């Protein structure tokens, strides 16, 4: 019920303006404090930085609530960093297990890829040489046009376009031809690689059913062990957070109770 009251109070009070809030050094009415608190909270979210938190804690409301937001923020950050650090070894353990169990398959696939790579290397080198040669010829043919561009006027734009269009189209068609030639040369090796991969997967499926079951059991066991190791770490992190959450909740409820008594 108190959560609902707090929510309604925040919804109704967010439209008010806390004028001269930072100059308030005298005790305020609970309603004013809650209104100012909401305004400062919105400004803090907007600023999203420690400067806003420090400014809030230096205000009248901040001093009275004494939330120690900056200290709590640093503490929570340290707790999160510790949790991440504690989790790292277990993540590494699972990763190493996975790499070890798939080492044989990865080695075979790498070997097949290297074989195909060596077969297609001449075609790639040939394509690269032709592509470079075509671009150089294109550059040389454009050199005179580039000189004319220095003195280009509106009257010469159409003439310049007429000169450039056939050159660009010819270069485009020739480059497309080289790409198509490369595609045709690589197609058989692409099919070969696809067939080898399919064959490896089929062999694993046919021969590796017992191994797959064993591996599945091993993964389940590792995940179970990981969960057991992670549980106390997460619980420790939760326990670190609880005091700050309870402290914040208690102070807000106290302020709201005082407000309800005042307006009653």
UniProtKB/Swiss-Prot annotation:
It comes from the Eukaryota. Disulfide bonds: none annotated. Residues 1-18 form the signal peptide. GO terms for molecular function: cholesterol transfer activity; phosphatidylcholine-sterol O-acyltransferase activator activity; phospholipid binding. Sequence repeats lie at residues 67-88, 89-110, 111-121, 122-143, 144-165, 166-187, 188-209, 210-231, 232-242, 243-264. GO terms for cellular component: chylomicron; extracellular vesicle; high-density lipoprotein particle; low-density lipoprotein particle; very-low-density lipoprotein particle. Keywords: Cholesterol metabolism, HDL, Lipid metabolism, Lipid transport, Repeat, Secreted, Signal, Steroid metabolism, Sterol metabolism, Transport. It is found in: Secreted. Residues 67-264 are annotated as: 10 X approximate tandem repeats. Major protein of plasma HDL, also found in chylomicrons. One of its GO terms (biological process) is cholesterol metabolic process. InterPro entries: ApoA_E (IPR000074), Apolipoprotein_A1/A4/E (IPR050163). Participates in the reverse transport of cholesterol from tissues to the liver for excretion by promoting cholesterol efflux from tissues and by acting as a cofactor for the lecithin cholesterol acyltransferase (LCAT). Belongs to the apolipoprotein A1/A4/E family. This is Apolipoprotein A-I. The gene is APOA1.
């Amino acid at each position: 019920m108190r959560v609902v009251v707090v929510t309604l109070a925040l919804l109704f009070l967010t439209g008010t303006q806390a004028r001269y809030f930072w100059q308030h050094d005298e005790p305020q009415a609970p309603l004013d404090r809650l209104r100012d608190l909401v305004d400062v909270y919105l400004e803090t979210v907007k600023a999203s930085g420690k400067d806003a938190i420090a400014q809030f804690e230096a205000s009248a409301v901040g001093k009275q609530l004494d939330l120690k937001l900056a200290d709590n923020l640093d503490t929570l950050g340290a707790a999160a960093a510790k949790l991440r650090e504690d989790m790292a070894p277990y993540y590494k353990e699972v990763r190493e297990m996975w790499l070890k169990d798939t080492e044989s398959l990865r080695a075979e696939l790498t070997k097949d890829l290297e074989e195909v790579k060596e077969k297609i290397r001449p075609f790639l080198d040939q394509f690269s040489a032709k592509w470079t040669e075509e671009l150089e010829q294109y550059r040389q043919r454009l050199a005179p046009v580039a000189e004319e561009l220095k003195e280009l006027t509106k009257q010469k734009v159409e003439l310049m376009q007429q000169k450039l269009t056939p050159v660009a189209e010819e270069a485009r068609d020739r480059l497309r031809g080289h790409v198509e030639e490369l595609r045709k040369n690589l197609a058989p090796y692409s099919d070969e690689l696809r067939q080898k991969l399919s064959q490896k997967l089929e062999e694993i499926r046919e021969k590796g059913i017992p191994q797959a079951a064993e591996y599945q059991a091993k993964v389940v066991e590792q995940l179970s062990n990981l969960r057991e190791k992670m549980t106390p770490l997460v619980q420790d992190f939760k326990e670190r957070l609880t005091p700050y959450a309870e402290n914040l909740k208690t102070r807000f409820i106290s302020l709201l109770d005082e407000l309800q008594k005042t307006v009653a």
